[in-house]
């Protein structure tokens, strides 16, 4: 008898269910989650670059790897933004870190979100990718509320190999994503 870790999913069941649902001929046709991108944009970084240090540290805590600082692609004078200014940070998770993050998201983070009734089923891009936003970073168990200087939101993009939204939605449902009806 083998002991199974609490934070893992049974991919053979997910694959079997998807093959049965969509009548795939080969296992290679079954959609998979390719990567998860976590992005935190910080508008305050225009005036105070030190704010980015907090964001980088928080992303490092919740993802387990070092984030990349994102820079402005073009200048916008109304926001006093110049091209190349640091305005946020992002992390791309693949492999075991991606799986652990998705598991943590569905089992720990969503239950801690205030007034949570499920995630929207309309946030697919038409090509099987899903985007969602969280309003506060303190819902993650790694973030210490006492050390947070300002509550910030984040974007989480789940990139799949699915060809359309229905395949991607079924895949994410099998991963444990709680969609609204």
UniProtKB/Swiss-Prot annotation:
Give a single Pfam family match: Ribosomal_L5
Q: Which GO terms describe its biological process?
A: translation
Q: Its GO CC terms? A: ribonucleoprotein complex; ribosome
Q: Which PROSITE patterns match?
A: RIBOSOMAL_L5 (PS00358)
Tell me which UniProt keywords the record has, alphabetically: Ribonucleoprotein, Ribosomal protein, RNA-binding, rRNA-binding, tRNA-binding
Enumerate the GO terms in the molecular function aspect: rRNA binding; structural constituent of ribosome; tRNA binding
Under Gene3D superfamilies, the record lists: 3.30.1440.10
Supply the InterPro entries for this chain. Ribosomal_uL5, Ribosomal_uL5_bac-type, Ribosomal_uL5_C, Ribosomal_uL5_CS, Ribosomal_uL5_dom_sf, Ribosomal_uL5_N
The protein's matches in SUPFAM superfamilies, at most eight in alphabetical order, are given as: RL5-like (SSF55282)
What is the documented function of this protein? This is one of the proteins that bind and probably mediate the attachment of the 5S RNA into the large ribosomal subunit, where it forms part of the central protuberance. In the 70S ribosome it contacts protein S13 of the 30S subunit (bridge B1b), connecting the 2 subunits; this bridge is implicated in subunit movement. Contacts the P site tRNA; the 5S rRNA and some of its associated proteins might help stabilize positioning of ribosome-bound tRNAs.
**What PANTHER family does UniProt report for this protein, alphabetically?**
60S RIBOSOMAL PROTEIN L11-RELATED
NCBIfam families in the record, alphabetically? PRK00010.1
- Give the protein family: Belongs to the universal ribosomal protein uL5 family.
Oligomeric and partner information = Part of the 50S ribosomal subunit; part of the 5S rRNA/L5/L18/L25 subcomplex. Contacts the 5S rRNA and the P site tRNA. Forms a bridge to the 30S subunit in the 70S ribosome.
Protein name (record):
Large ribosomal subunit protein uL5
The organism's taxonomic lineage, starting at the top: Bacteria, Bacillati, Mycoplasmatota, Mollicutes, Acholeplasmatales
